[in-house]
From Swiss-Prot:
Residues 1-22, 85-95, 165-185, 391-397 are extracellular. This is Muscarinic acetylcholine receptor M1. The lineage of its organism: Eukaryota, Metazoa, Chordata, Craniata, Vertebrata. GO terms for molecular function: G protein-coupled acetylcholine receptor activity; phosphatidylinositol-4,5-bisphosphate phospholipase C activity. It comes from Homo sapiens (Human). InterPro entries: GPCR_Rhodpsn, GPCR_Rhodpsn_7TM, Musac_Ach_M1_rcpt, Musac_Ach_rcpt. Glycans are attached at N2, N12. The keyword Cell cycle does not apply. The muscarinic acetylcholine receptor mediates various cellular responses, including inhibition of adenylate cyclase, breakdown of phosphoinositides and modulation of potassium channels through the action of G proteins. Primary transducing effect is Pi turnover. Pfam families: 7tm_1. Belongs to the G-protein coupled receptor 1 family. Muscarinic acetylcholine receptor subfamily. CHRM1 sub-subfamily. Residues 238-247 have a biased composition (Low complexity). Its main location: membrane.
Length: 460
């Protein structure tokens, strides 16, 4: 859909030439009906996926959720009413329905553009100011920005569309047609096209270029960091199994007859892992940046007390450490770790940067797909708007109709972009379409590294 000109553009051309054959009418009706169905289905899947899969409830996906709401409005109302308009050859639903349709159409379309801008700025600041911006990047603030985007879109278009005829004292829209009255002049249409399409696209492309440059710089820094690693003899990080062997230094053997008090506790903690997971959502805030202030490579041992079932009374002595220890980064552990642990600092720093870089690239890939779809579907119509400003009769009627419908198709493509670039969306879509979501709820769902996760299970 478009925010720069009325359907079938200006009043100097006929909306749809009468006398189209039945095969043409059938083809237009079936094609546009299928596109509308695909748009509604795809964006409903986005909304349902966000509801049922908690992994998708990230700050970045809040913006995608808002974009899906705008696309759902377009697929439900705008596409079908415009198809009726085309097939009948005139507007037969009255002036009030015309103005309400245009207001809803243009508000939803402008909200789509605003949401794309929000996504672009969010990605830009996340990459260029990862510490200061992400501290302020909360769901509440994201919801506030989304609400502001919709409010601005409503204020810009709805009052002008609905009340312009009362401001000027008359309605000049031709009988049987439906278009925005104040856009009947090509020069005004040109100005709105510049403000509603060309300016936002320029800003988004500039931001994407800056994101790309910053990501490439980080990739080069990471390559240099990895190239400078020189593991020493016996250095590097030992595996967790090696560190937890009975009899190893710092982990005395557990006396026989003792058992772990926590053996039936829910599985709440996962060991810190720097392994890249494909299930990682690109907008997730559950990254390892929370330990930025901690010294890489340091660790502390969290000792899990062991209880002797034969003991008659509790003792005041501290519990002995056991092989079941969990290690996590902290500030003071490096000096206690010994000389053999020194090379782990650079290694873990490199892995943390790799993890962050992978997330940024995935997020940039989603943004690039959405931005590319937006440009490809909206540009033809807006080029025709510019041409009509200088040559009123140079654009054929059929091209106007195709160009305007191509803007609508952007709402159909967006959910496909989410699925292609985001494995979490793709898997959730598949399970919902196969009616297998309930089964998934009771199996272990892979989580991102370092996250706190309770494994779905009927048992403790």
């Amino acid at each position: 859909m478009n925010t720069s000109a009325p359907p079938a553009v200006s009043p100097n051309i006929t909306v749809l030439a009468p006398g189209k054959g039945p095969w043409q009418v059938a083809f237009i009706g079936i094609t546009t009906g299928l596109l509308s169905l695909a748009t509604v289905t795809g964006n409903l899947l986005v909304l349902i996926s966000f509801k049922v899969n908690t992994e998708l409830k990230t700050v970045n996906n809040y913006f995608l959720l808002s974009l899906a709401c705008a696309d759902l409005i377009i697929g439900t109302f705008s596409m079908n009413l415009y198809t009726t308009y085309l097939l009948m050859g005139h507007w037969a639903l009255g002036t009030l329905a015309c103005d309400l349709w245009l207001a809803l159409d243009y508000v939803a379309s402008n909200a789509s553009v605003m949401n794309l801008l929000l996504i672009s700025f969010d990605r830009y600041f996340s990459v260029t100011r990862p510490l200061s911006y992400r501290a302020k990047r909360t769901p509440r603030r994201a919801a506030l920005m989304i609400g502001l985007a919709w409010l601005v879109s409503f204020v810009l278009w709805a009052p002008a569309i609905l009340f312009w005829q009362y401001l000027v004292g008359e309605r000049t829209v031709l009988a049987g047609q439906c278009y925005i009255q104040f856009l009947s002049q090509p020069i005004i249409t040109f100005g709105t096209a510049m403000a509603a399409f060309y300016l936002p696209v320029t800003v988004m492309c500039t931001l994407y270029w800056r994101i790309y440059r910053e990501t490439e710089n980080r990739a080069r820094e990471l390559a240099a960091l990895q190239g400078s690693e020189t593991p020493g003899k016996g250095g590097g990080s030992s595996s967790s199994s090696e560190r937890s062997q009975p009899g190893a230094e710092g982990s005395p053997e557990t006396p026989p007859g003792r058992c772990c008090r926590c053996c039936r506790a829910p599985r709440l903690l996962q060991a810190y892992s720097w392994k890249e997971e494909e299930e990682e959502d690109e907008g997730s805030m559950e990254s390892l940046t929370s330990s930025e202030g901690e010294e890489p490579g340091s660790e502390v041992v969290i000792k899990m007390p062991m209880v002797d079932p034969e003991a008659q009374a509790p003792t005041k002595q501290p519990p002995r450490s056991s092989p079941n220890t969990v290690k996590r980064p902290t500030k003071k552990g490096r000096d206690r770790a010994g000389k053999g642990q020194k090379p782990r600092g650079k290694e873990q720093l490199a892995k943390r940067k790799t993890f962050s870089l992978v997330k940024e690239k995935k997020a940039a890939r989603t943004l690039s797909a959405i931005l590319l779809a937006f440009i490809l579907t909206w540009t033809p119509y807006n080029i025709m708007v510019l041409v009509s400003t200088f040559c009123k009769d140079c654009v054929p009627e059929t091209l106007w109709e195709l160009g305007y419908w191509l803007c609508y198709v952007n709402s159909t493509i967006n959910p496909m972009c989410y699925a292609l670039c985001n494995k979490a969306f793709r898997d959730t879509f598949r399970l919902l379409l196969l009616c297998r979501w309930d089964k998934r709820r009771w199996r272990k769902i892979p989580k991102r590294p370092g996250s706190v996760h309770r494994t779905p299970s009927r048992q403790c």
